[in-house]
Every structure is written in C-alpha cells, then in structure tokens.
Amino acid sequence: GSDKKILLIWESYYTTSSKSWDIINFPEKWYFDSPQADIDGIKEFAKVKEKEEYCRHWNFASKMHPKGIDRKSRTFSNVENLLKKYFPKDKNPFEFCAGYNFYLRPAETSKTIGEKSIDNEIAAKTLKEVIRILTPEYVVFFSKKSYEEFKDYKKEFPTVVFKAFTHPACRWWNKAYGKEGQSGKDRFKDFLEKKVFNTMA
C-alpha cells in the first residue's frame, strides 16, 4: 500500500489560549495584519514527556505522529484503525499519507470556526496548491463542510479521486445513515478496499 499517494483532509485547528482570541476571531487580522511575533507568542506547547517537538498544538505532527498529543483521539485513531491493515504492522500508517486541516484560521476550543468567505477562499486556494505540489492520487475529506467548500475545484484535477466522509469523531462514524444505510466507518472501509487498494477485486 505504500505506493499509493493519499492526502487526508480534516477540518479545523483549535486553540486553548484566550490570548489568541483577539487575533483568531477577526479573519482579516489573522491572515493579513497580525505581526509574526504575536502569532508565535500564542503557539502553545504541551509538556508530554520529552517529545515537546511533537506536541505543538498547531503542528499537525501532534495529530499524526505516534507520540502526538492528539493521536489517540477518535478523530485520528478511527482513521488509523482502518488504514493500518494496508501497511506493515510495525509502521505508523500515517507515515504513508499526507494530512492537514482545511481551515487555516484556528477555532476556539471545541467550537466551530464560524467560517467567513475569506476563510473558504484562502482554504480552497491553499489546498489547490498542496494538491499541485504533492500530486496525490486520492484526496479524502473527513469533513463534509470542507468538501462542500472545495468540490467546485475538483474539475481542475481530473486525475485525482476525491471522496468525503463524515467526521471520525461524530456519531455517524459508527451509526448507519443515508440511502446506503452504512456508517461513515463502513463507507471509508469500502472505499479503501474497493477503490484505493482493490482488495475486493
């Protein structure tokens, strides 16, 4: 499975620091008017053993690295559990995938970003550039909101397979819904088996 080029897209970053809210609650300020020193000042570090380099909240390594502070959350463990069967048993399956969050302005902890048009525009333009640089075969969204904002740009990448699934931490990951009568977990499992790795052929 390591020859497959897969880009995984989640939804939002979060910040737990109230010091950052004056910046992140104003999109134009966040993207264009905040001095770098202010942004650097609100990047938080969690003290988890000696692996501080993997624990920065805004660093995606905190989510995809085996020792990352967010790695055991359902948002990532539910995805990992389905991916790992396709990669060597002693390997982290996320080593073979790229991943990041669609929205680039953090939300307050556990709150929706409350995105503005500028958030959607910058997020979509950024993802287009990421796709052009990484040239993935598959782009998988674990955020229907993010997918809806990006789907009109799919035509610019005719060789890329795009697919959206429900968020791995929401109730529909394990609960059947829709015309197919499948859970998000089963839909993702079928996609991996039938479309990506062709193990059902």
Regions found by a protein language model. Name each.
Residues G1-Y138:
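A polyanion-binding, active-site-adjacent surface
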Residues E11-S12, P136, K144-K145, H167-P168:
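An acidic- and aromatic-residue-enriched active-site/binding cleft used to recognize and process polar
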Residues S110-K128, K145-A201:
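C-terminal capping/extension of enzyme domains
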